[in-house]
């Protein structure tokens, strides 16, 4: 049996990354965990985000995944480097791929980033952007109302438009030509965001993250070559039917393999740690 790629997120937003991986790598099986019961992660203390993320990682390791994608910007900012240091499988985050894409696209070297409170407070995007181009100007804005909006299924219409317009008001007239959606929930609001910022190029990290996953699989000779069609499994700490409906209606991900799970307490991950 082929070893799957593991993907984790604070909820359903990581499906925007999962769908892009499924599109670019159709032979690769995926195991996805979305922690909708404890979403959003953005306002939570760092140690809580760390604990929740490691619980999901532990569950993925019991699924014998060959790679982990942290498809949550808040969790990427908190856990990515320590996960890479401690695990013996590749771990991919979503921050640097988004930063690379923004630098490539921006013509005036002026980029804005919107994200959760935790992601913006971490300065992870600013550091990633400056590591690529130290002269790029960066605007950052937390938009804490976006994730709850998406999780409740309000991605268009008057309510979504009003929340997005009010949240983005501080960025109006700032002079940037490129906007990074620094949360994997936000691409589901992309049409509404683009309507508020019509002259700005909007970047989501899913496509670039999928490219990095593909490159790492080939580099480590882990890419699936024989399977005709991949089988995917999805887990949520929330309500399985709601997850299934949102995945189908928003991202055209149709699956009967959605199960509700409970994550509580640290899971034994030591067996997969790198030997000292």
Swiss-Prot record:
<comment type="similarity">
    <text>Belongs to the aspartate/glutamate racemases family.</text>
</comment>
<protein>
    <recommendedName>
        <fullName>Glutamate racemase</fullName>
        <ecNumber>5.1.1.3</ecNumber>
    </recommendedName>
</protein>
<keyword id="KW-0573">Peptidoglycan synthesis</keyword>
<comment type="function">
    <text>Provides the (R)-glutamate required for cell wall biosynthesis.</text>
</comment>
<keyword id="KW-0413">Isomerase</keyword>
<feature type="binding site">
    <location>
        <begin position="9"/>
        <end position="10"/>
    </location>
    <ligand>
        <name>substrate</name>
    </ligand>
</feature>
<dbReference type="GO" id="GO:0071555">
    <property type="term" value="P:cell wall organization"/>
</dbReference>
<dbReference type="InterPro" id="IPR033134">
    <property type="entry name" value="Asp/Glu_racemase_AS_2"/>
</dbReference>
<keyword id="KW-0133">Cell shape</keyword>
<feature type="binding site">
    <location>
        <begin position="184"/>
        <end position="185"/>
    </location>
    <ligand>
        <name>substrate</name>
    </ligand>
</feature>
<dbReference type="InterPro" id="IPR018187">
    <property type="entry name" value="Asp/Glu_racemase_AS_1"/>
</dbReference>
<feature type="active site" description="Proton donor/acceptor">
    <location>
        <position position="72"/>
    </location>
</feature>
<feature type="binding site">
    <location>
        <begin position="41"/>
        <end position="42"/>
    </location>
    <ligand>
        <name>substrate</name>
    </ligand>
</feature>
<dbReference type="GO" id="GO:0009252">
    <property type="term" value="P:peptidoglycan biosynthetic process"/>
</dbReference>
<dbReference type="InterPro" id="IPR015942">
    <property type="entry name" value="Asp/Glu/hydantoin_racemase"/>
</dbReference>
<feature type="active site" description="Proton donor/acceptor">
    <location>
        <position position="183"/>
    </location>
</feature>
<dbReference type="GO" id="GO:0008360">
    <property type="term" value="P:regulation of cell shape"/>
</dbReference>
<comment type="pathway">
    <text>Cell wall biogenesis; peptidoglycan biosynthesis.</text>
</comment>
<keyword id="KW-0961">Cell wall biogenesis/degradation</keyword>
<feature type="binding site">
    <location>
        <begin position="73"/>
        <end position="74"/>
    </location>
    <ligand>
        <name>substrate</name>
    </ligand>
</feature>
<dbReference type="InterPro" id="IPR004391">
    <property type="entry name" value="Glu_race"/>
</dbReference>
<dbReference type="Pfam" id="PF01177">
    <property type="entry name" value="Asp_Glu_race"/>
</dbReference>
<dbReference type="GO" id="GO:0008881">
    <property type="term" value="F:glutamate racemase activity"/>
</dbReference>
<dbReference type="InterPro" id="IPR001920">
    <property type="entry name" value="Asp/Glu_race"/>
</dbReference>
């Amino acid at each position: 049996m082929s070893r799957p790629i593991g993907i984790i997120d604070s909820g359903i937003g990581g499906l925007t990354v999962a769908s892009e991986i499924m599109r670019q790598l159709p032979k690769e099986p995926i195991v996805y965990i979305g922690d909708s019961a404890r979403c959003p992660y953005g306002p939570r203390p760092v140690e809580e985000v760390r604990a929740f993320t490691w619980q999901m990682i532990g569950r993925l390791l019991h699924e014998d995944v060959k790679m982990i994608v942290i498809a949550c910007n808040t969790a990427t900012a908190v856990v990515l480097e320590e996960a890479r240091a401690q695990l013996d499988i590749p771990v991919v985050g979503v921050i640097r791929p988004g930063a690379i894409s923004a630098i490539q696209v921006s013509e005036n070297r002026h980029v804005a980033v919107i994200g959760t409170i935790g992601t913006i407070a971490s300065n992870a995007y600013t550091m990633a952007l400056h590591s690529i181009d130290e002269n790029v100007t960066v605007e950052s804005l937390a938009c804490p109302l976006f994730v709850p909006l998406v999780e409740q299924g309000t991605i268009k219409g008057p309510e979504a438009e009003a929340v997005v317009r009010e949240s983005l008001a501080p960025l109006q007239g700032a002079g940037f030509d490129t906007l990074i959606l620094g949360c994997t929930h936000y691409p589901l609001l992309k049409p509404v965001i683009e309507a508020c910022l019509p002259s700005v190029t909007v970047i989501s990290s899913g496509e670039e993250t999928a490219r990095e996953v593909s490159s790492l699989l080939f580099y480590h000779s882990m890419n699936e070559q024989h399977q005709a069609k991949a089988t995917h499994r999805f887990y949520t700490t929330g309500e399985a039917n709601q997850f299934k409906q949102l995945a189908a209606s928003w991202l055209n991900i149709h699956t009967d393999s959605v199960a509700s799970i409970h994550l509580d307490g640290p899971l034994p991950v030591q067996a997969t740690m790198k030997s000292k």
